[in-house]
Swiss-Prot record:
Record propeptide residues: 1-11
Name the record gives this protein: Flagellin B4
InterPro entries in alphabetical order: Flagellin/pilin_N_arc, Flagellin_arc
Compartments where found: Archaeal flagellum
Gene Ontology CC: archaeal-type flagellum
Alphabetical GO biological process terms: archaeal or bacterial-type flagellum-dependent cell motility
UniProt keyword terms in alphabetical order: Archaeal flagellum
One Pfam entry name: Arch_flagellin
Gene name in the database record: flaB4
UniProt similarity note: Belongs to the archaeal flagellin family.
The species this protein was found in: Natrialba magadii (strain ATCC 43099 / DSM 3394 / CCM 3739 / CIP 104546 / IAM 13178 / JCM 8861 / NBRC 102185 / NCIMB 2190 / MS3) (Natronobacterium magadii)
A GO MF label: structural molecule activity
Domain of life of the source: Archaea
Entry function: Flagellin is the subunit protein which polymerizes to form the filaments of archaeal flagella.
Length: 261
């Protein structure tokens, strides 16, 4: 009277279902791989952006002072000089708080001045001497405006010898420094950038010329002077930019004085 129930039914999966399952697993694996690669790329980009942001902060240059030295050259009224002019522009620079070493030889100064615009790079005075015949950065002339065939000690050069397209760097002793020494670090907490106001884009003297500014023709050869303005962007090697505005007073009261720009 007992009934023995047996079940011979078994679960079966169709081949189509199995194919779909395998396909889903493969798609999930591919998607996971894509997500992992994307996450890695985003992490790398984030790290690179973080490093760039850090460099922009750690390699920023501070401009501490901006002064101009009034030329002591006397020009008569017959020469057409109806206003003062500068013989050099001096920018005191230092590394911003917490900054790393900053190489001024790799720094660019973008200038918009009365005579146009230009990108200035550092002029290296060389190891021991500056040769007047090099296509370099310092031109030495005699009293008659002729190119001096001899060479001169780098520390004896003055700002009027800096060609357009360049700037010089001066240490605390008042001497031009070489590229290897133009570094803002613990030893050089502050250096001075020297600009020549006679050459473009500050003045109108032609950069290729080997002659000094002709003070007898100020109508066509004008130096940066009273009432002039110029905008500077000092770009460090990392790309950090410091903006500096130069505004000369409308009147220079005394030759040889230092005026705030």
């Amino acid at each position: 009277m007992f009934v023995n129930e047996t079940t011979d039914d078994r679960g079966q999966v169709g081949i189509g279902t199995l194919i779909v399952f395998i396909a889903m697993v493969l798609v999930a694996a591919i998607a996971a791989g894509v997500l992992i690669n994307t996450a890695g790329m985003l992490q790398s980009q984030a790290e690179a952006t973080g490093e760039e942001s850090t460099d922009l902060v750690s390699e920023r240059i501070d401009s501490t002072t901006a002064v101009g030295i009034v030329s002591e050259t006397e020009v008569s009224e017959e020469a057409g000089a109806d206003r003062g002019e500068l013989e050099e522009i001096r920018l005191g620079v230092s590394g911003a708080a917490g900054s790393d070493n900053i190489d001024l030889s790799e720094t660019i100064i973008q200038v918009v001045g009365p005579q146009g615009q230009d990108n200035l790079v550092m002029a290296d005075p060389g190891d021991d001497e500056i040769d007047a015949n090099d296509d370099g950065f310092v031109t030495v002339t005699d009293e008659d405006g002729n190119v001096d065939g001899d060479s001169t000690d780098a520390t004896d050069a003055d700002p009027s010898h800096i060609a357009s397209g360049h700037f010089a760097v001066e240490n605390e002793d008042g001497n031009f420094v070489e590229e290897s020494d133009a570094v803002l670090d613990n030893d050089n907490g502050e250096l001075t950038i020297i600009l020549n106001p006679k050459v473009a884009p500050f003045g109108s003297q032609i950069s290729e010329s080997d002659e000094e500014l002709d003070l007898q023709d100020l109508d066509t050869e004008d130096a940066f002077g009273a009432g002039d303005e110029s905008s500077l962007s000092i770009v460090s090697p990392s790309g950090a930019t410091t903006e500096v505005e130069l505004n000369a007073p409308d009147l220079f009261s005394e030759d040889g004085e230092a005026v705030r720009l």
